[in-house]
């Protein structure tokens, strides 16, 4: 049975003459009435290199959709550049922007009763925000991202944004060298070239099934990226007709993003050592989808999924462009599926099951298509460009070496332990997250005295001022979703630790979060957070923190009685209990509202709205 068009509320009937007049004023042709209206949800902005090349793409998608008879209308969301917002109070706005993006998409699409949508995303909070909206709306949706930036090159080696941050804080590096790194680290459009948050989410979108093959890995500058947008436009029209004309609800986001799809996506994330932010985002998207997917599932998967792909910042050898050459996300999914670690029966927006997509697109599959080979041979041009599709370079051959190449099979895994782990203990009763792919195995077991700071700013000053020494555990409190408010990323503190050559000699733990560019023994999302009465807010300078990644534990060496006494003393502060004792920070009304409504990190840091 076919489903009625949502847009019929504004396009049919005598009383809708005014609305139809406005649709005509928007350019709708007579023959387009009665057909699906497709929203193009773009995120173009000139503040973000991951989005600066999207200004013409929305209209390209519109033209492709309208070739097939439907009407398409474009609008934009906000988009924050985490790298530019980093290191000052601008970062307080990053995570809250995810929910604002989700709201804005819901508002626009529901207000105008669009029937389907193409989501053009790319960077950190934009993809998860649009994903959250797609689950709320549950109308046919296809995602296509702006693609990864090419890796920078200097002195014969790859580099990226994180190199610029680390070297700029290293007093042994000359100003001339820093200028050279700065000029070469980010060679144009696309989201930063490592497996940071933006690229991680665009890759996970392939695993969830809402994005087409190559979405996460074909560089932004390549002509094949433009073809991906055309393919997405054709796919959304096909899916809209499947749902509204044919009554096929298998194309709806909630029927694609099932519990098993989230398990598949998290297995991929663990296997490729993706950003810890993906934990927050997948939990948030699953909550909007009504999928039974929780922190306990992530813990379970982390104990059985090996690390099959190691990319910057976890190594200097490979960037996302190298993952593409090795067969992209479906190349990794193929290895996971062969080992029985993902479910091949999950559905996708392109109408295939995961198993069918792997058979068609995995470069080591005997049935791999010429289209797939062409996608994964898409190469960087090694020149500066801020224009999508400005080059057509190809690798001469693919990387199909599963023993020593970029993507490994299970037998030759980088490590039997996966790239992410959930730890628990007396200062993280509800869990915390560490990217094990970025931690040297020599410090998987670590203990040391706490150096406590009640803000990121204070921690940066302490690290650069020499207050942190070898063996210390830096503890940053009151930077969680509620305590920040906004749950800042701690990229500068971790980068400064590296710049002081303490990357393998110190740990950092926080109720805040980390950039996807972070590596080292950096443990975030500690829940409950300090501002919610979490025990991390009871840690004091000199307390011994014990971290054991193999045993998935993190504790402060204090008895239950000692912690209870400290809690009693803290609560005696009255209204000031579990607030930062020394921090001076102005918090806007918008951020205060977010802080009063937000859930803890182990629940995805989403807003709580009472029924």
Swiss-Prot record:
Single biological process term from Gene Ontology: L-valine biosynthetic process
Its pathway, per UniProt, is:
Amino-acid biosynthesis; L-isoleucine biosynthesis; L-isoleucine from 2-oxobutanoate: step 3/4; Amino-acid biosynthesis; L-valine biosynthesis; L-valine from pyruvate: step 3/4
**UniProt-annotated binding residues for Mg(2+):** 82, 124-125, 489
Q: Which prosthetic group or cofactor does it need?
A: [2Fe-2S] cluster; Mg(2+)
Where does the record place the catalytic residues?
515
Q: Which organism is it from?
A: Parabacteroides distasonis (strain ATCC 8503 / DSM 20701 / CIP 104284 / JCM 5825 / NCTC 11152)
For whether the record's keyword set contains rRNA-binding, the answer is no
Basic and acidic residues composition bias: residue spans: 565-574
What does the record give as EC number?
4.2.1.9
Per the record, residues carrying N6-carboxylysine are 125
Q: What molecular functions are annotated in GO for this chain?
A: 2 iron, 2 sulfur cluster binding; dihydroxy-acid dehydratase activity; magnesium ion binding
One GO CC term, this protein: cytosol
Is the keyword Zinc assigned to this protein? Answer: no
Q: Which residues bind [2Fe-2S] cluster?
A: 123, 192
Function (record text) = Functions in the biosynthesis of branched-chain amino acids. Catalyzes the dehydration of (2R,3R)-2,3-dihydroxy-3-methylpentanoate (2,3-dihydroxy-3-methylvalerate) into 2-oxo-3-methylpentanoate (2-oxo-3-methylvalerate) and of (2R)-2,3-dihydroxy-3-methylbutanoate (2,3-dihydroxyisovalerate) into 2-oxo-3-methylbutanoate (2-oxoisovalerate), the penultimate precursor to L-isoleucine and L-valine, respectively.
**Which reaction equations make up its catalytic activity?**
(2R)-2,3-dihydroxy-3-methylbutanoate = 3-methyl-2-oxobutanoate + H2O; (2R,3R)-2,3-dihydroxy-3-methylpentanoate = (S)-3-methyl-2-oxopentanoate + H2O
Name the family: Belongs to the IlvD/Edd family.
Entry keywords, A to Z: 2Fe-2S, Amino-acid biosynthesis, Branched-chain amino acid biosynthesis, Iron, Iron-sulfur, Lyase, Magnesium, Metal-binding
Question: Which protein is depicted?
Answer: Dihydroxy-acid dehydratase
């Amino acid at each position: 049975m076919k489903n009625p068009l949502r847009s019929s509320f504004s396009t049919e009937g005598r009383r809708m003459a005014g609305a139809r007049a406005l649709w005509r004023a928007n350019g709708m042709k007579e023959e387009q009435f009665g057909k699906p209206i497709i929203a193009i949800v773009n995120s173009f902005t000139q503040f973000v290199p991951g989005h600066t090349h999207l200004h013409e793409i929305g209209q390209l998608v519109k033209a492709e959709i309208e070739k097939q008879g439907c009407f398409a209308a474009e609008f934009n969301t906000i988009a924050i550049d985490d790298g530019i917002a980093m290191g000052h109070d601008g970062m307080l706005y990053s995570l809250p922007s995810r929910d604002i993006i989700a709201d804005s998409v819901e508002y626009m699409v529901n207000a105008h009763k669009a029937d389907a949508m193409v989501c053009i995303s790319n960077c950190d909070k934009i993809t998860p925000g649009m994903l959250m909206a797609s689950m709320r709306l549950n109308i046919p949706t296809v995602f296509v991202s702006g693609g990864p930036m090419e890796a920078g090159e200097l002195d014969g080696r790859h580099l990226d944004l994180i190199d610029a941050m680390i070297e700029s804080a290293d007093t042994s590096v000359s100003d001339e060298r820093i200028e050279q790194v700065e000029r070469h680290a980010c060679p144009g459009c696309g989201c930063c070239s490592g497996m940071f948050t933006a690229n991680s989410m665009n890759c996970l979108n392939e695993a969830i099934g809402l994005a087409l093959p190559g979405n996460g890995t074909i560089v932004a500058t390549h002509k094949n990226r433009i073809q991906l947008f055309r393919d997405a436009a054709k796919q959304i029209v096909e899916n809209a007709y499947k749902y509204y004309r044919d009554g096929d609800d298998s194309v709806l986001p909630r029927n694609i993003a099932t519990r098993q799809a989230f398990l598949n996506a998290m297995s991929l994330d663990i296997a490729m050592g993706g950003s810890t932010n993906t934990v927050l985002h997948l939990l948030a998207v699953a909550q909007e989808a009504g999928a039974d997917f929780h922190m306990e599932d992530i813990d379970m998967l982390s104990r059985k999924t090996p690390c099959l792909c190691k990319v910057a910042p976890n190594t200097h050898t490979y960037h996302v462009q190298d993952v593409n050459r090795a067969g992209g996300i479906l190349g990794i999914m193929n290895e996971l599926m062969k080992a029985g670690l993902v479910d091949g029966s999950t559905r996708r927006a392109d109408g295939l099951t995961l198993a069918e997509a792997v058979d068609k697109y995995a470069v080591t599959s005997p049935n791999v298509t010429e289209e797939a080979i062409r996608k994964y041979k898409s190469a960087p041009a090694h020149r500066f460009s801020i224009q999508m599709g400005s080059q057509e370079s190809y690798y001469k051959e693919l990387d199909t070496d599963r023993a020593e190449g970029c993507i490994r099979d299970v037998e030759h895994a980088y490590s039997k332990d996966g790239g992410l782990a959930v730890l628990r203990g007396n200062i993280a009763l509800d869990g915390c997250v560490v990217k094990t792919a970025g931690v040297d195995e020599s410090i998987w077991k670590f203990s040391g005295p706490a150096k406590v700071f009640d803000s990121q700013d204070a921690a940066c000053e302490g690290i650069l001022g020499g207050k942190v020494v070898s063996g210390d555990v830096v503890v940053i409190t009151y930077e969680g979703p509620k305590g920040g408010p906004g749950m800042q990323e701690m990229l500068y503190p971790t980068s400064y630790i590296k710049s002081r050559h303490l990357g393998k000699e110190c740990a950092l733990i926080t109720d805040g979060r980390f950039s996807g560019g972070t590596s080292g023994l950096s443990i975030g999302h500690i829940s409950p957070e300090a501002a919610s009465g979490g025990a991390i807010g009871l840690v004091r300078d000199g307390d011994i923190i014990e971290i054991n990644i193999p045993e998935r534990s993190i504790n402060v060496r204090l008895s239950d009685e000692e912690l209870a006494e400290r809690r009693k003393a803290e609560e005696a502060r009255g209204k000031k209990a579990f607030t930062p004792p020394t921090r001076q920070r102005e918090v806007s009304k918008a951020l205060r509202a977010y802080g009063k409504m937000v859930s803890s990190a182990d629940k995805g840091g989403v807003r709580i709205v009472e029924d």
